[in-house]
């Protein structure tokens, strides 16, 4: 009988709701501390562990040590040359995924030195010393045959005959850092050659601002700050000659007068003298180069230099502008103020390094800026794959005055621009974690001075 009634009810459209005997209570404000629910973060949240950072750096090191062999071969026979007295005009560097001489690898050499300092592991420093000293030996051979050495297919043409700031600045700064870290004295002659190009041969505007005639006459590329100023600053530190510091400061201030938007706290990528209106495209990596330039300059600029306070205030203003635009997953966008442009790794790594370094130096407040650096690193480390490759890095990029150009630049793990910055960011985060208590308080990352009983602030 019961079965028939149930059948009739179903046939006539009635539905029966069945309730379980043990009903689970619904989460409400009255029965749950909702603020303690665990968020679904897109990247790890909270302070990184030093051992985890070192593991990331080790992975990158292993990949790069294999990908950039420190060897010489005969161009024709491909035979390895182990006796440097047997070099010939046909000697070239053993091929790898990345070139040993490039502005990107100048960053990587300096980054390896920083990683060695932060971790205490000598392999990072040895990476740079081995390759830089090899470059010096090969350059010395080709220097004795200048016609051969300056030909386009010479492995050291850009060392002996630099023709652009891209050739000179980053490698020069890295060579000086290497020299100060135990590199062979023979590097000094190539340092002098690079500096001579930057100081005397590179095209400048009438007021002395470093410029290019590409893609238009009298054009400033923000990237060129990094391709010149760190080398000038390091040379000032090496020689004690203030003329290098003066030129370095002049470049930062005169670029900034033309290219820094004080309201946005950001730099435009390009500036052309003959334009009546200057389109402002805030490309992420060029802003990274500018911030890294000021960071490296302040590292060695004498405290009593008359331009120091102005450079320091520019750095602080720039960091404030960048801070406003970090995405929710810790990365910054390819065009910083356009959230529909893709998220980019190399710029994020540079920003993370510079912010962490500025905190460690006492230039900016740890409480306000530290969580941003932690989030930046947590995002960056997710872009280092199991092979040690850095993903999500924009390839080399020219200048444009339309957004589509920047939106559609490819990314590639072979883009050399990402490796040095990621190593730098990791190394500086290790130092940051040693200098502050970084904890989770009330579910958020907080920075406290060492020795603080932060539990009383819960």
Indicate where each model-derived feature is located.
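Bacterial Sec-dependent N-terminal signal peptides
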Residues: 1-23
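CBM-like carbohydrate-recognition segments
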Residues: 22-103, 118, 122-125, 130, ...
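Active-site mouth of glycoside hydrolases
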Residues: 45-48, 214-215, 277-278
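Alpha-helical support elements that line or immediately flank enzyme active sites
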Residues: 112-115
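Extended ligand-binding groove/face enriched in aromatic
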Residues: 125-126, 136-270, 387
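Short, solvent-exposed loop/turn elements at beta->coil junctions and helix N-caps
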Residues: 215-216, 337-339
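Extended ligand-binding clefts on enzyme/binding-domain cores
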Residues: 222-334, 341-352, 364-398, 402, ...
């Amino acid at each position: 009988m019961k079965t028939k009634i149930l059948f009739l009810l179903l046939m006539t459209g009635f539905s029966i709701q069945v309730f379980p005997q043990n009903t689970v209570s619904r989460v409400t404000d009255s029965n749950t501390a909702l603020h303690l629910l665990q968020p679904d973060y897109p990247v790890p949240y909270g302070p990184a562990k030093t051992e985890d950072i070192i593991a990331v750096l080790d992975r990158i090191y292993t990949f790069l040590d294999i990908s950039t062999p420190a060897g010489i071969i005969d161009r024709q026979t491909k035979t390895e040359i182990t006796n440097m007295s047997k070099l010939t005009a046909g000697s070239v560097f053993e091929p790898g995924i990345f070139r040993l001489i490039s502005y990107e690898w100048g960053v990587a050499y300096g980054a390896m030195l920083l990683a060695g300092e932060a971790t205490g592991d000598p392999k990072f420093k040895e990476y740079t010393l081995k390759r830089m000293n090899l470059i010096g030996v090969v350059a010395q051979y080709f220097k004795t045959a200048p016609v051969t050495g300056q030909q386009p297919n010479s492995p050291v043409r850009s060392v002996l005959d630099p023709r652009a700031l891209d050739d000179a600045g980053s490698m020069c700064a890295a060579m000086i850092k290497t020299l100060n870290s135990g590199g062979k004295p023979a590097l000094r002659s190539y340092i002098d050659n690079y500096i001579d190009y930057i100081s005397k041969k590179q095209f400048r505007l009438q007021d002395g601002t470093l410029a290019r005639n590409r893609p238009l006459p009298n054009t400033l590329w923000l990237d060129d700050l990094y391709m010149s100023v760190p080398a000038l600053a390091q040379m000032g530190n090496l020689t004690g000659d203030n003329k290098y510091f003066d030129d370095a400061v002049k470049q930062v201030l005169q670029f900034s007068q033309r290219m820094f938007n004080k309201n946005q706290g950001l730099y435009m990528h390009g500036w052309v003298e003959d334009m009546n209106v200057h389109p402002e495209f805030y490309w992420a990596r060029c802003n990274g180069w500018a911030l890294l330039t000021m960071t490296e300059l302040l590292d060695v600029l004498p405290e009593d230099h008359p331009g120091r306070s102005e450079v320091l205030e520019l750095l602080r203003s720039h960091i404030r502008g960048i801070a406003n635009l970090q995405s929710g997953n810790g990365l910054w966008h390819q065009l910083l103020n356009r959230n529909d442009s893709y998220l980019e790794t190399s710029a994020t790594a540079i920003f993370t390094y510079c912010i962490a370094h500025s905190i460690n130096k006492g230039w900016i407040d740890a409480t306000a800026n530290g969580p941003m650096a932690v989030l930046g690193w947590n995002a960056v480390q997710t872009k280092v794959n199991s092979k040690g490759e850095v993903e999500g890095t924009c390839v080399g990029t020219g200048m444009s005055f339309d957004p589509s150009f920047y939106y559609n630049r490819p990314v590639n793990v072979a883009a050399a621009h990402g490796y040095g910055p990621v190593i730098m960011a990791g190394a500086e985060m290790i130092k940051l974690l040693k200098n502050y208590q970084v904890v989770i308080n009330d579910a958020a990352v907080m920075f406290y001075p060492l020795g603080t009983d932060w539990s009383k602030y819960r």
